[in-house]
């Protein structure tokens, strides 16, 4: 089979994906693709498309769509970097294929003409891995029905002995698909370590879940540490040396990308550190209304961060968006206190970390009495729920530090939560 026999066919991406590997090898050989046997199926399909497009004087376009306020958009290879923009997407193409910000688009682009900076997308082959026609039928995120979380994300990792923190969370503050949880933490209470453990646990226990770690106004070395410590998750960051506009733009893009995945029935977990810093950044970029709350916070500044957090939901039609966001307290800033008070009660789960427990080097520094999950009966088995209620009744009169020490001591003697609950019965 020669190139002239294959190139005119210009097979769509979906047809290439449906072919078996030997058929793709045959096409690749005819197109003169080198080392095609070393490529995985998806990469091979893209390589074939690239060769076919090149033969017709076009280029393969692939990237995340960012739609501007003027109606047109750009494909950028990097989820966050506008400098990676390579292809212009006209308003007509966006309307024709019902494209939205955050969509991952594969298609063909006309190469830039003289004095043009970008090529232009002329044909869409796939949207988020779907056929373009199927993508047109997608429901809108805001039209989907939110329900209470009813499937627990079990964080316990049987393969490691260093899992007491996650075992405690599983029992006392169970996290479900679609949870909207706040991790309320003073400085140096172990919130970053807890987030890392949760991220690693979910990526390992639930391969079907897309995990995004969003770090806003964070130290650069913390970002590096997260990227090296967390495997299988997308770590997206805007460090403290970036302007507040960049913080907000990064968060907006992550928000839109997560919504696109959920619209197709996927499951996403966003770990945000922190909602407080995101609200601070949004306060700086929001046009002043003249109505200022205590601490210098504009009354309109919390609208978008609340929209971000409020997107967390379990979807009746399928899919879920789970958000675990840290809220900073006891920082000495009146603004931080106001932000926390505004977000208090918006979540359906709270993990409250205690400075007193941290000072006594008790980790997780979880205040058992103040932490909990709403409608936990939908997540835990009835027999587990009864034992948890009994445990909470026993420790209700204890000092939080003593209660956590006792609980960790008992749990440390068992290999997993099943054994611990069986021991409680005894």
From Swiss-Prot:
Ranges of residues in domain Rho RNA-BD: 58-131
Residues annotated to bind ATP: 176-181, 188-193, 219
EC class (word): hydrolase
Enzyme Commission number(s) of this protein: 3.6.4.-
Pfam families: ATP-synt_ab (PF00006), Rho_N (PF07498), Rho_RNA_bind (PF07497)
PROSITE patterns per the UniProt record, alphabetical: RHO_RNA_BD
GO biological process: DNA-templated transcription termination
One function term, GO molecular function aspect: helicase activity
Keywords: ATP-binding, Helicase, Hydrolase, Nucleotide-binding, RNA-binding, Transcription, Transcription regulation, Transcription termination
Xref: SMART domains: AAA, CSP, Rho_N
Sequence similarity: Belongs to the Rho family.
Protein task: Facilitates transcription termination by a mechanism that involves Rho binding to the nascent RNA, activation of Rho's RNA-dependent ATPase activity, and release of the mRNA from the DNA template.
Record's subunit section: Homohexamer. The homohexamer assembles into an open ring structure.
Protein name: Transcription termination factor Rho
Source species of the chain: Deinococcus radiodurans (strain ATCC 13939 / DSM 20539 / JCM 16871 / CCUG 27074 / LMG 4051 / NBRC 15346 / NCIMB 9279 / VKM B-1422 / R1)
